[in-house]
Amino acid sequence: MAKMGLKPDPATTNQTHNNAKEIRYRGVRKRPWGRYAAEIRDPGKKTRVWLGTFDTAEEAARAYDTAARDFRGAKAKTNFPTFLELSDQKVPTGFARSPSQSSTLDCASPPTLVVPSATAGNVPPQLELSLGGGGGGSCYQIPMSRPVYFLDLMGIGNVGRGQPPPVTSAFRSPVVHVATKMACGAQSDSDSSSVVDFEGGMEKRSQLLDLDLNLPPPSEQA
């Protein structure tokens, strides 16, 4: 008769596979009833400090990491790195950044304004367009080609220059009379003398100035 072999216990087989797959953490021990205990050694007192019992190995490992950072600070050896430790990790020398990331960053950055270098040949002239001037409320006066006086506007400023006036003789006589009467009225002491008389004074003044301004002035006699 062939001997029948004993079948392996399934509970023992599952426990063996679980022990093989289970990750061991620093400062964590598994209890026989399935829970996990965490403890750490105090470097100052040289004693072991009990941290507690947890349901999972990860919880016990995190409790150990917290206690290790309290005792040893940045030199502590932990099971899980913190977010700051992950961000401080440098990229290995053999690996380079992909060109797609660099191109994305370049496109996201704002364009740089390129200012051309100014030379003496292509510099445009500076135009003053402000109405108030350089400052202080002052204004600039535009220079004229030739000063214009009041007598030039009235048509009698070009007599001594040998040039005919731009106005007609009919309009010239009352203008001369008005200017003369206004000047005489300004020198008078009474207020009534400043009134210009256009009726009687015009004939008297035209008789006194019986000159044709369209002709050149007479030559001086020695």
UniProtKB/Swiss-Prot annotation:
Superkingdom classification of source: Eukaryota
GO BP field: cellular response to hypoxia; ethylene-activated signaling pathway; induced systemic resistance, jasmonic acid mediated signaling pathway; negative regulation of DNA-templated transcription; negative regulation of ethylene-activated signaling pathway; response to abscisic acid; response to ethylene
Coiled-coil features, chain-numbered ranges: none
InterPro entries in alphabetical order: AP2/ERF_dom (IPR001471), AP2/ERF_dom_sf (IPR036955), DNA-bd_dom_sf (IPR016177)
Cross-referenced SMART domains: AP2 (SM00380)
Primary location recorded for the protein, binned into one broad class: nucleus
Keywords: DNA-binding, Ethylene signaling pathway, Nucleus, Plant defense, Repressor, Transcription, Transcription regulation
Gene Ontology cellular-component terms listed: nuclear body; nucleus
Subcellular location: Nucleus
Induction behaviour: Induced by jasmonate (JA) and by Alternaria brassicicola (locally and systemically), but only slightly by ethylene. Strong induction by wounding, cold or drought stress does not require EIN2, whereas induction by NaCl does. Transcripts accumulate in cycloheximide-treated plants, a protein synthesis inhibitor. Seems to not be influenced by exogenous abscisic acid (ABA), and heat stress.
Gene Ontology MF term list: DNA-binding transcription factor activity; transcription cis-regulatory region binding
Subunit text: Interacts with SAP18.
Role description: Acts as a transcriptional repressor. Binds to the GCC-box pathogenesis-related promoter element. Involved in the regulation of gene expression by stress factors and by components of stress signal transduction pathways, and could also regulate other AtERFs.
Name of the protein: Ethylene-responsive transcription factor 4
Species of origin: Arabidopsis thaliana
Recorded name of the encoding gene: ERF4
